[in-house]
Amino acid sequence: MKIYFTRTILLASHLNNDFLKIINEFKEPENKENLLILFKKHLESIAFDKYNSLIQEVLEIESKKYNLKNKMEEILKIKSLEKFLNWHREIILSLDFAELSNIKFIQNNLIHLSQSNWEIALDEYWNASIVLNNLSKPPKQHYFLFQQTGHYDSILETNVVEYKLSKYEYFLLQQFYKPKELIIVIKDFIDVFEVQSSVEYNALYSEIRHMLKIMIFNKLIIPQHNRIIQI
């Protein structure tokens, strides 16, 4: 359980010493489907006063990640699909951008966009003090995503990874909730900004192209006909 709800436990224990005692005595159920229910019940038994909304938001996000993890047979299917997408991605990225921009892309349905009032997403450099410091800051909009992958992390016991996103990456990805040509997305995205000169336009255009290529490389957006229907 401590693996799945690291941030919630860390924050709750920091705010209330009684919670740490409860967690240390917690016995995980054999049925993992009941784990989240029991964990929430234990969390609700402790008062966090003005921090309740923060605790609930962190728990909600970690619960989402927990519920996204796949069974081993599903992970193997994703792995097989990733091999195909990797092969096709190399072909796509070798195209001239003028040709690439006319292809319809859509969000990979294995990614799940999220936002929070605190910087919750973890990276490989995280530690307890960083997490607690981030959660002590005033609320501010932060963006990230969860991605179901074909790799099972035996230490974290999940195949779900998380990535921090900039505001622009988040809103750019949102444009692909339905199939769209890159050229249309670029135009719509640039129209949001009040571009004053050709220099500003070219700089913005170049940055959007760069973000889109990274999204394609990371399989966050994929050609419409490659959309994974079901796992």
Q: What are the roles of these predicted feature ranges?
A:
Residues 97-105, 111-113:
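Aromatic/basic-lined ligand-recognition segments
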Residues 101-103, 135, 155, 211:
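Homeobox/homeodomain signature
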Residues 1-96, 161-231:
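Long, charge-rich, low-complexity alpha-helical segments
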Residues 109-176:
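Low-complexity, glycine/alanine/valine/leucine- and proline-rich hydrophobic stretches
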